[in-house]
Each structure stands twice: as C-alpha cells, then as structure tokens.
Amino acid sequence: MTPNWIFLGALLGAVSVGAGAFGAHGLAARLDARSLELWETAARYLMYGALALSMTGLLGRMGVVRGVDGAGWCLLAGSLIFSGTVAALALGGPRWLGAVTPIGGTLLIAGFLLFAWAALKS
C-alpha cells in the first residue's frame, strides 16, 4: 500500500511550523545562541522535507511522475532523522546523535535524487 505522501508532508509541515514557533517563543530565553541556531536548522529542514514530500505525493497522484514511493520513503525518513537528531542536540541530547545526523542528510539527498530520477523516467 502506498502511503499518502501528501498527508504526511502536510503533517511534517505543521510540525515544522510548530517547532519554529516553539523555538522562537518557548526556547529563545532558555537556549544559548548556538543551540537556538540548531533548533532553527531542524525546523527549517523539516519544512524542506515536508514541501518535497507533499510535492512528491501530489505529482505522483496526478500521474505526472510515476514511481515516487522510494523518494517518499527517503524524504520521510531523512527528514525525521536529520531534523530529529539536530533538534535533540539543540536540547542537550547525547553527542553521539551528531554521528547519526548525516544519515538523515544522506537520505534526504537520496530522496531528492530518486524523485529526479522518477521524473526523468516519466
């Protein structure tokens, strides 16, 4: 069964906006400048993933681009891993999470490349 990439992208977008607002209003007085910068990076990249995932789903559903599921899975996993680990580091999470963050980034890149490949083949 193909996941509803549009729904998942919209959900990630909502979480991204909420995370950004929480960072600006709830964490600004509690985090140092570097940690706040990390939090903002996590929220921003979550939005990038949300928009890409929504676009992947929309174009896939319209039949403009076929075979988008691989891209969707990579974009979803990459967004969650990258943004999740960066946000955890901003909040003082264990430093070993820094070694996991590039896995999320690599999955995001793979998702964009798989989407490009699917678009090229369609």
Put a short name on every predicted segment.
Residues 1-122:
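Polytopic transmembrane helical bundles with strong interfacial aromatic enrichment
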